[in-house]
């Protein structure tokens, strides 16, 4: 019987059935259907009915998928840190590149929490946080001078994932890609622009 699993690695190399040569990649957090498995390799069923092979250690059984509680969020954030350095790609959600909302969506999808695709849509969902952000909360940024309570709409242009406290991880545009920054002016990774343009914090569980 086929079993479902979730991609655990930052990228998963798909190999063909013959020489198991690399033929494609699967991104972090995607669900797959495992039809055969040993300690080293797992066979996945494709929509076309053929089989491809991936390393078993790069898959997490669906039953072990973390929950969006404090422990699961900390675990998933640890995995997300492995994505630091991946390029920014508008519309992307794979090891070829992520955009800001693609990263936040992949983060929550890994814990089986569905959230909208775009940053402004994500800011309309979840629970508005009035106090300090907790790890896993989403930070929304946009035009300066707009109050946090009004940030559920078109002013949102960027989203990041709180690491707890002032630090956050996000997919930054340009040549930066996925990186860690801070809202703390005393931090070596302080981002003044984003600190000045923080509009809202929202929580998803």
Residue ranges, per PLM feature:
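Aromatic- and glycine-rich peptidoglycan recognition patches
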Residues: 66, 93, 153-157, 162-205
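Boundary regions of SH3-family modules and the immediately adjacent low-complexity/disordered segments
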Residues: 1-8, 17, 31, 38, ...
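SH3/SH3-like (including bacterial SH3b) beta-barrel domains
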Residues: 12-28
């Amino acid at each position: 019987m086929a079993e479902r699993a979730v991609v655990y690695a930052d990228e998963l190399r798909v190999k063909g059935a013959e020489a198991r040569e690399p033929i494609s990649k699967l991104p972090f957090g995607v669900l797959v259907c495992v039809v055969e498995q040993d300690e080293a390799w797992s066979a996945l069923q494709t929509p076309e009915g053929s089989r491809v092979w991936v390393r078993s250690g790069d898959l997490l059984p669906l039953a072990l998928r973390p929950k969006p509680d404090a422990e699961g969020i900390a675990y998933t954030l640890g995995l997300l840190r492995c994505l630091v350095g991946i390029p920014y790609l508008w519309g992307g959600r794979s090891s070829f590149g992520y955009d800001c909302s693609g990263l936040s969506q992949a983060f929550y999808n890994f814990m089986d929490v569905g959230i909208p695709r775009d940053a402004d849509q994500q800011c309309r969902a979840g629970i508005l946080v009035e106090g300090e952000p907790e790890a896993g909360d989403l930070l929304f940024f946009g035009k300066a001078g707009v109050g946090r309570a009004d940030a559920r709409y078109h002013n949102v242009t960027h989203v990041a994932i709180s690491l707890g406290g002032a630090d956050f991880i996000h997919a930054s545009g340009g040549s930066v890609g996925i990186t860690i920054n801070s809202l703390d002016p005393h931090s070596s990774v302080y981002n003044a622009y984003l600190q000045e343009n923080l509009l809202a914090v929202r929580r998803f569980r």
